Amino acid sequence: MWAAGRWGPTFPSSYAGFSADCRPRSRPSSDSCSVPMTGARGQGLEVVRSPSPPLPLSCSNSTRSLLSPLGHQSFQFDEDDGDGEDEEDVDDEEDVDEDAHDSEAKVASLRGMELQGCASTQVESENNQEEQKQVRLPESRLTPWEVWFIGKEKEERDRLQLKALEELNQQLEKRKEMEEREKRKIIAEEKHKEWVQKKNEQKRKEREQKINKEMEEKAAKELEKEYLQEKAKEKYQEWLKKKNAEECERKKKEKEKEKQQQAEIQEKKEIAEKKFQEWLENAKHKPRPAAKSYGYANGKLTGFYSGNSYPEPAFYNPIPWKPIHMPPPKEAKDLSGRKSKRPVISQPHKSSSLVIHKARSNLCLGTLCRIQR
């Protein structure tokens, strides 16, 4: 007997790549299993026909008849008791195998239709024909344990099929999300490239505008500089012309002034020369002064005439000069009083006066004589 659980024979290593939906069957002729296949345009299930491995030698005809309906998804029990108990087991096994094969083909086609979202008319016609060929097993030939076992296996099969469908749907959703993510990524990259290109174009335009603006400002500054230089040259020429005119006028005035001064000097010279000639003429006829000079000749005082001596003054002040009395300052008086505390002895003061006596001789003019009175 086989081990309890999945109730399936052990597969060789070549059948390990198939999905859980692939089940061994009693007949090695034509079995099918649904394998997820991804194409260029969509995803879905593709029905792959694969020969079932041969059952072990220990399996009898009754065991094959017991295990053959396990892959039948749409298997239903007959409530009416059949009368064909006397038929041979070989015919029953062949009928059950054909029904299981037809039901599996229908399940695979239905799953492919659900996943791909499209069904062909040919598959529908085949399914209708297969549904008509289904043969319900009489319940009288199965024991209660077999009925329970088959129901459990059908539930397990349905659960596994639903799980496979859910996993496949999840894979499809994940793949769709990945495709959408890749699409969004490509769109984002394209938008980023467009944005970068736009920014570069904008920067280039701004740079060109800046360069053009700088060149325009530079040209305007150069034009303004040239205009200012020309204006400055004109102003300088006007100023230079004005200065030259002023310099010429100043030199002209200086020449006129110098000429006038020379004329005045010449006139003064002429007048002075004229006056000198007149004085010289008059001096010849003017009487000489008396000999008022004195000198010693042969040891005797004698008078003689000298033209170098000063003439006798015509007037002199007969009142002798007296110095003005200036009282000493108070501070000096106080300081002198503090320094000398000795009693001052009064001495008789001899009044003297200086009298300027001008001798009548020319030898000692302005002689000071001290006369004591």
From Swiss-Prot:
Residues 61-76 have a biased composition (Polar residues). It holds the Pfam family CCDC34. InterPro entries: CCDC34 (IPR045323), CCDC34/181 (IPR025259). Residues 77-101 have a biased composition (Acidic residues). The keyword DNA repair does not apply. GO terms for biological process: spermatogenesis. The modification Phosphoserine is found at S52. It is linked to Spermatogenic failure 76: An autosomal recessive male infertility disorder characterized by oligoasthenoteratozoospermia, and abnormally shaped spermatozoa in the semen of affected individuals. Sperm flagella have multiple morphological abnormalities, including short, absent, and irregular caliber flagella. A chromosomal aberration involving CCDC34 is found in a patient with hamartoma of the retinal pigment epithelium and retina. Translocation t(11;18) (p13;p11.2). Involved in spermatogenesis. Has a probable role in anterograde intraflagellar transport which is essential for the formation of sperm flagella. This is Coiled-coil domain-containing protein 34. The lineage of its organism: Eukaryota, Metazoa, Chordata, Craniata, Vertebrata.
